[in-house]
Amino acid sequence: MKRILSIITSLFAVSFLLAQSNNSIATSSIKIEMLFPEGKTKALILSFDDGTFADRRLVKLMNDYGLKGTYHLNSNKLDTKGYLSKDEIKSLYKGHEVSVHTANHPALTALSKIDIIYEVVEDRKELERLTGNIVRGMAYPFGNNNDLVVDAIKGLGIEYARTVKDSYNFMIPEDFLRWDPSIHQFGKAYFIPNDSVNDKKELAGFYKLVIDFLKSDSPALLDVWGHSWENDGVGERWIEMENFFKMVSKRTDICSATQIALVDYINAYKNLKISVDKKIISNLSSMDVYIKIDNKAYKISAGSQLSIKKD
């Protein structure tokens, strides 16, 4: 009996190998790549924390250049000295994303699980009340996180959580609850007071990364984070911010988007249903998804199916 089973197994293996050599199966090696919304090859996230008065100037600057921003706010600090009023949140951030930064900006790694949950849920609830929108994103205060913190925010409706650990690359993070940005605004320029040598070095590094992003031939995501208040009181920093916006705003190959919009888009791409030979691709999501196969771009409309015709 064992010998018969061995023979059957061997025959099955041979049949499988022959099937693999068939042209219709061999096409499964087709490489499918994600493009960003509207078929763009690059995407830009601009992510700023805290919700201070300086956000007013930054939002206006973004609006002037047609850029989208993601703003992480501490709801219990609103209506206090130096921070925005609750009454202006909805109108000020119209067209941008408002996201969780916890209610009081504590170091979450120093809190118990129940206090972590409180900080996130209370902030989310109040920001939803102020904006009239569902809030699904977050930035960790001080960037502080660990396994306990990440475990605590799971199930709270948070779909991404940004750190402050610069990656210096253009890759999409694998873990959205440990989302490392590309770089801080201007690198670490201006971190050390009155150190023009360091400022020059860090600015050069920042602009080099931006230029590398602009020159990239592969799909690339540039995620720049910071605080609007870092620019306040120092004119040249606002000038630098505007120079950066000028560099990226008129590029037709860049998709400027809020972080949650890109998260939704990436998830829609990940949830595409693909046939074994990769010739049929179904998009069950409510948004259009763009892909590239053999250097050719395809649009898969929301709720539709794409059939690839290849020789």
What do the PLM-derived regions correspond to, one by one?
Residues 1-21:
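Bacterial Sec-dependent N-terminal signal peptides
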